[in-house]
Curated annotation (Swiss-Prot):
It comes from Shigella sonnei (strain Ss046). The record marks H358, H392 as: Transition state stabilizer. SMART domains: Bgal_small_N. It catalyses: Hydrolysis of terminal non-reducing beta-D-galactose residues in beta-D-galactosides. Binds 2 magnesium ions per monomer. The gene is lacZ. This is Beta-galactosidase. PROSITE patterns: GLYCOSYL_HYDROL_F2_1 (PS00719), GLYCOSYL_HYDROL_F2_2 (PS00608). GO terms for molecular function: beta-galactosidase activity; carbohydrate binding; magnesium ion binding.
Length: 1024
């Protein structure tokens, strides 16, 4: 044990937090989570241990701008200014200091290993009573599961130790410091340390004791570490559980270790041995270790599909059977290996349906509770995810247990990121930083290696490629050869990774960056000498209204076996709740706390909002990742199972046929398909519709029974096909009254019964409609070529930087947002049974014509207004965001009814999950409340739209809400939006894709850009 004076002044003088060679003082060695049961049955059933005591709860807290401002007296007693805070928590969430959101740029001046003199410091203290029996024998430890970023610990005024690495436990022996009765802990937490240079992740920078604190009492002679591994014969019919156990304390001949393996209430195998390890070299073996091997016949294998778990109980006892202590862990029998260019689990090639997940809560910052963790896992499973990357640090220890039990594959990632360094490997190639990096990697492996869910180790994120990475790669491969190692830095295919693991590589497009080219994922596989599997560590940047082009990745994954999936960036929006002057909550992002530097809304890239409400894009991910694939041939549906291990046993296939949303026939049957097999389902003779319309066959896979992660009735997969239809024959219309045209100097007015239409002859726009005396429009019907910019359109996060290549900057520079209409033509003609208005406009900016729009409005005796639009786009202007019409309707109806794709928001490059049907939703549900307002709520493939007294028919896309595109574009946060008068309707003949390969470069695929030059669309507007 290192002993230094208890004086605060001496600790401050040492400045351990500015020394990369000091990562800890007196911290105990890493190991799996312990509970020190004194009853093996309690260990087997995972009951709460009486030897493990939580110190979570109310602690005293005082904040200071720098450690030097902390008074020496604090070591002995609480300060008068101390407040009460809950541990675990981030002190910024209690109003102390400000959270800082930055992506790449360090939040402090870059001068490693030194940190600013103004270094916010939190002083925590807790008084507690200790069980006297704990003082009489054994060892009492204190465990801090997570403290950001570094801390010194005192107990009863005496200095105990120091720790850093905010995402792994720091554990200390308190035995020599405790006394009977009351004891006082004092923890001085520093916001910045040299470790902060290794923690430059894309996240909020917060501080404090943000994970659990607990006391653990161990016997003097104790289990100090244990490691389990599983091995198999070729066909997995026989397995061996290998358990290596290490002890600490007095090594006595009478000591024994028993390892028993349980499957529920049944003991499967057991073995007992004295200490004394196998011979390692010419000097012998470890006297304090023992390895036991248990044979298991026909093991129930673990996978994310079927997470079969056993329970291993490790007992330390004497030769007469007296139990000293027991530890335990869940065991999953599974094998991970790379063979022939494929990542295999239990001999089967995995397809990673993954997502990156930050530990984030809108109210609690980076504090994770079990309820939130379970909620995340259930949502992931329900949306067909099978893997999660712990981006970019080891998670709360409970997370791994939950992933073991519910079934998720985990990439466990070291808490190392130096993204803001120039070059990025400035520290990771420096041997002075090897000890700090080594602690972060080796301790992660030692803590988490017993979890079957952990199938891949990661050396960190965005830290370049340095010699330290190579050293740590070799250490992991030596200590744990049972798992592959991945690391993206330095180009995603260095010698420090077993898996090609690029981020944001595109399917077909190369990005030849200097030094670290990012090839298309298809090309990467075929590079000379390259035989590794490719799994994208990050892809499909889900920032705001995004995930366009997601289907293209999944087409490639299914086409090329060595393209084994990837991890979407990312799971949850990292917005934080703030309160306005009236106490109303609102969602905040970078800069909203006065934090500098900041990257604004770049912290919100989630498939779910911060409160875990799904984004519409989550449904697209669910559909593309579904485990059942379908093909229709005549009356036969071929169902292919992509499950590797699971035979369908809780699935019904429901099919239905509908004509324009009207059901014609339906049925259901059980799915009985083996893993990686097919089932052919013969449908009955389908009815022939008597009228014209869109005829669709829809299949859903429904789970009739609840599972551990889903309720009864859960839909896991679906598909639609448009069937052959009857030809549409238009019968002559019955005679109607003829609309009357009235012409004045300013207007053309058409009247039919109680309806009137008014066209302004100076503007050429439909300026008003009446039904009876009620006006229907608040603004004229106009062309629209722009959208409120998406994050993907903006392309940058820094408030001080503009990317001229971003879509929004190109649109602005070309004048799309400022364009004004110059009237070229506005005429009226009376036909035999209709009135025809013909208009033409040149949309211009600074004398340059960007678009020419020609329209005809044919109003017939039935009251229908048929609108035909032809648009020409100037060859030298950027491709527009949309080609459509917009107006502000006077009505505010409660519901929207449409026949088209839905029910969720969908866009041309993100619509495979949408189904054609007749949908009916509240108006409020037609708006997607992205925290950073943008274009939202589009529904594609629409044949009919009904709202209030109005109906629109044709083939178009629309969105409808209380917010104009102008307001969405000018508003920074959703809570600042105000419902405008009436309802804004946007009807598009064509709409550009939204992109999403990444959010900082134009990522809309060419096929989803409006590049044709000329466009034609038409629709009918009438009253019901």
């Amino acid at each position: 044990m290192i002993m230094i004076t208890d004086s605060l002044a001496v600790v401050l003088q040492r400045r351990d937090w500015e020394n990369p060679g000091v990562t800890q003082l007196n911290r105990l060695a890493a190991h799996p989570p312990f509970a020190s049961w004194r009853n093996s049955e309690e260990a087997r059933t995972d009951r709460p241990s009486q030897q493990l005591r939580s110190l979570n709860g109310e602690w005293r807290f005082a904040w200071f701008p720098a450690p030097e401002a902390v008074p020496e007296s604090w070591l002995e007693c609480d300060l008068p200014e101390a407040d009460t805070v809950v541990v675990p928590s981030n002190w910024q969430m209690h109003g102390y200091d400000a959270p800082i959101y930055t992506n790449v740029t360090y939040p402090i001046t870059v001068n490693p290993p030194f940190v600013p003199a103004e270094n916010p410091t939190g002083c925590y203290s807790l008084t507690f009573n200790i069980d006297e029996s704990w003082l009489q024998e054994g060892q009492t430890r204190i465990i801090f599961d997570g403290v950001n970023s570094a801390f010194h610990l005192w107990c009863n005024g005496r200095w105990v130790g120091y720790g850093q690495d905010s995402r792994l436990p720091s554990e200390f022996d308190l035995s020599a410091f405790l006394r009977a009765g009351k004891n006082r802990l004092a923890v001085m937490v520093l916001r910045w340390s040299d470790g902060s240079y290794l923690e430059d992740q894309d996240m909020w920078r917060m501080s404090g004791i943000f994970r659990d604190v607990s006391l653990l009492h161990k016997p003097s002679t104790q289990i100090s570490d244990f490691h389990v591994a599983t091995h198999f014969n070729d066909d997995f019919s026989r397995a061996v559980l290998e358990a290596e156990v290490q002890m600490y304390g007095e090594l006595r001949d009478e000591l024994r270790v028993t390892v028993s393996l349980w499957q529920g209430e049944t003991q499967v195998a057991s073995g007992t041995a004295p200490f004394g390890g196998e011979i390692i070299d010419e000097r012998g073996g470890y006297a304090d270790r023992v390895t036991l091997r248990l044979n298991v016949e026909n093991p129930a294998l673990w996978s994310a599909e079927i997470p079969n778990l056993y329970r291993a109980v490790v007992e330390l006892h004497t030769d007469d059977g007296t139990l000293i202590e027991a530890e335990a862990c869940d065991v999953g029998f599974r094998e991970v290996r790379i063979e022939n260019g494929l990542l295999l689990l239990n001999g089967k090639p995995l397809l990673i349906r993954g997502v990156n997940r930050h530990e984030h809560h809108p109210l609690h910052g980076q504090v994770m509770d079990e309820q939130t963790m379970v909620q995340d896992i259930l949502l992931m499973k329900q949306n067909n995810f099978n893997a999660v990357r712990c981006s970019h640090y080891p998670n709360h220890p409970l997370w791994y247990t939950l992933c073991d039990r519910f079934g998720l594959y985990v990439v466990d990632e070291a808490n190392i990121e130096t993204h803001g360094m120039v070059p990025m490997n400035r520290l990771t190639d420096d041997p002075r930083w090897l000890p700090a990096m080594s602690e972060r990697v080796t301790r992660m492996v030692q803590r988490d290696r017993n979890h079957p869910s952990v199938i891949i180790w990661s050396l960190g994120n965005e830290s370049g490629h340095g010699a330290n990475h190579d050293a740590l790669y070799r250490w992991i491969k030596s200590v744990d050869p049972s798992r592959p190692v991945q690391y993206e830095g330095g180009g995603a295919d260095t010698t420090a990774t077993d898996i090609i693991c690029p981020m944001y590589a595109r399917v077909d497009e190369d990005q030849p960056f200097p030094a670290v080219p990012k090839w298309s994922i298809k090309k990467w596989l075929s590079l000379p000498g390259e035989t590794r599997p490719l799994i994208l560590c990050e892809y499909a940047h889900a920032m705001g209204n995004s995930l366009g082009g997601f289907a293209k990745y999944w087409q490639a994954f299914r086409q090329y076996p060595r393209l084994q999936g990837g991890f979407v960036w990312d799971w949850v929006d990292q917005s934080l709740i703030k309160y306005d002057e009236n106490g109303n909550p609102w969602s905040a992002y970078g800069g909203d706390f006065g934090d500098t530097p900041n990257d604004r809304q770049f912290c919100m890239n989630g498939l779910v909002f911060a409160d875990r409400t799904p984004h519409p894009a989550l449904t697209e991910a669910k559909h593309q990742q579904q485990f059942f694939q379908f093909r229709l041939s005549g009356q036969t549906i071929e169902v292919t199972s992509e499950y590797l291990f699971r035979h369908s046993d809780n699935e019904l296939l429901h099919w239905s046929v509908a004509l324009d949303g009207k059901p014609l026939a339906s049925g259901e049957m059980p799915l009985d398909v083996a893993p990686q097999d097919k089932q052919l389902i013969e449908l009955p003779e389908l009815p022939q519709p008597e009228s014209a319309g869109q005829l669709w066959l829809t299949v859903h896979v429904v789970q009739p029974n609840a599972t551990a992660w889903s309720e009864a009735g859960h839909i896991s997969a679906w598909q639609q096909w448009r069937l052959a239809e009857n030809l549409s024959v238009t019968l002559p219309a019955a005679p109607h009254a003829i609309p009357q045209l009235t012409t004045s100097e300013t207007d053309f007015c058409i009247e039919l019964g109680n309806k009137r239409w008014q066209f302004n002859r100076q503007s050429g726009f439909l300026s008003q409609m009446w039904i009876g005396a009620e006006k229907q429009l608040l603004t004229p019907l106009r062309d629209q070529f722009t959208r409120a910019p998406l994050d993907n359109d903006i392309g940058v996060s820094e408030a001080t930087r503009i990317d001229p290549n971003a879509w929004v900057e190109r649109w602005k520079a070309a004048g799309h947002y400022q364009a004004e209409a110059a009237l070229l033509q506005c005429t009226a003609d009376t036909l035999a049974d209709a009135v025809l208005i013909t208009t033409a406009h040149a949309w211009q900016h600074q004398g340059k014509t960007l678009f020419i729009s020609r329209k005809t409005y044919r109003i017939d005796g039935s009251g229908q207004m048929a609108i035909t639009v032809d648009v020409e786009v100037a060859s030298d202007t950027p491709h527009p965001a949309r080609i459509g019409l917009t107006c502000q309707l006077a009505q505010v109806a409660e519901r929207v009814n449409w026949l088209g794709l839905g029910p969720q928001e969908n866009y041309p490059d993100r619509l495979t999950a949408a189904c054609f049907d007749r949908w009916d939703l509240p108006l409020s549900d037609m708006y997607t409340p992205y925290v950073f307002p943008s274009e939202n709520g589009l529904r594609c493939g629409t044949r009919e739209l009904n709202y209030g007294p109005h109906q629109w028919r044709g083939d178009f896309q629309f969105n409808i809400s209380r917010y104009s595109q102008q307001q969405l574009m000018e508003t920074s946060h959703r809570h600042l939006l105000h419902a405008e008068e009436g309802t804004w309707l946007n009807i598009d003949g064509f709409h550009m894709g939204i992109g999403g390969d990444d959010s900082w470069s134009p990522s809309v695929s060419a096929e989803f850009q409006l590049s044709a030059g000329s466009y034609h669309y038409q629709l009918v507007w009438c009253q019901k």
